[in-house]
Amino acid sequence: MLCPHCHQNSSRVIDSRPTDEGRVIRRRRECENCQFRFTTFERVEQTPLLVIKKNGTREEFNRDKLLRGLIRAAEKRPVTMEQMTEIVDEVENKIRALGENEVSSQAVGEYVMAVLPGVDEIAYIRFASVYRQFKDMNVFMAELQEMMKKEKARDQD
């Protein structure tokens, strides 16, 4: 493994432990050349998952792209990086559980929209405003009212 500090290819594993319910191995490494310590993660390579975009083009599912969208939506909100990573994990697991190699970007967005209100309502509205591309204030208000209806129903249960 190349050291991110000195770029030498000689590191040793100091600590290794499973994370993410055993699906990922976290390894602490130390460069034998400069003694810089860094962390790597190993996960099983799975068949590529393609996302079909609105215009019909296909691109590989990108966890980082989804995480960046969540980070933007949750900016300056009390949402931890761990929570956002868990959302990405949950969405990817749901998609892979379908057993398909392709999924629409709409389905990916809907999976996120199903989880996000339980984490942070403001992040949900921000994500929805980009994902649903609100054209005007009326569409935005309709989304808010729908969310408030669901919240009220949840409170009554």
From Swiss-Prot:
Cofactor binding note: Binds 1 zinc ion.
ATP-cone domain residues: 49-139
InterPro entries documented for this protein: ATP-cone_dom, NrdR-like_N, RNR_NrdR-like
Gene Ontology biological-process annotations: negative regulation of DNA-templated transcription
GO molecular function, one term: ATP binding
Family of this protein: Belongs to the NrdR family.
Record's function text: Negatively regulates transcription of bacterial ribonucleotide reductase nrd genes and operons by binding to NrdR-boxes.
HAMAP family registered for this protein in UniProt: NrdR (MF_00440)
Name used for this protein in its record: Transcriptional repressor NrdR
Native species: Latilactobacillus sakei subsp. sakei (strain 23K)
